[in-house]
Amino acid sequence: MPESLQIGMLQMDAGPDKEVNLERIGEGISDLRGNPDIVVTPEYMMGMEDGGVTRELVRKNSEPMRSGYVSKARELAEANGVALLTTAYVEEEDDIYNTSIFIKEDGEIGGTYRKVHLFDAFGHRESDLFSWGDGVTVVNWNGIKVGLATCFDVRFPELFRIMNFRGADLILVPSGFYAGEHKGKQWETLINARAHENNFFVAGVNHPEPHFVGRSIVSSPLGYEVERFGGDEEYGLVEVDLGEIKESRERMPIKKLARHKFYRRFAPYDGD
């Protein structure tokens, strides 16, 4: 594992034109000062309108994984010599998945993740737009194990604990965390908790206000925020000390102390 990592965060809006959004990602990468190792975008980068996502737009903009949109994203990563974590509406047969795509710096796809927990809350029905994902993704990249999650997933610590058990060092969370009463504080609390309770870094990248909470965060396993943006559109480079992962695990060895046999006595849960 390297000593440190430079994470580029693009807290940006997205419009209905997926090609324009992709161009803006490229511009955002160019605007980052320094040398990012990986760049992370928000969720819904394949298209939003009026601060939200509609069934019609998802169907219009969705493409298969081997498509022009994903190919152009791969070209962006390779041209800039950076890894890129972005999102797409990926068609597969009769389904469309809200998919995070980890693209390595050579343009090859390192891994994909289909959003497991769809946002059917606060009056939204994301399951009307997408099919449910059913897998866990941890990518081996340059000596770092990178787990993938998406937005609403942060409310479900089980997914993050599974990635902990699979050895994840860093979780990337592209997000469209909607604004609302107390929502900004909820976002901060959830990202920070998922990092500290699992001995890994978590980088959550969101869309800006007013429709979303902004506040993109990188949280350390030691229990503090390395960086937190404000509410406006913002691009920034965040350096993390990867030695804090080992330090955290030595001080508080969560995976070692977890009582797996005890948990299995009460799982699976078949509640309503």
Q: Regions from the language model: what does each represent?
A:
Residues 20-29, 156-161:
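Short, acidic/polar
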Residues 2-8:
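Extreme N-terminal starter segment of soluble prokaryotic enzymes
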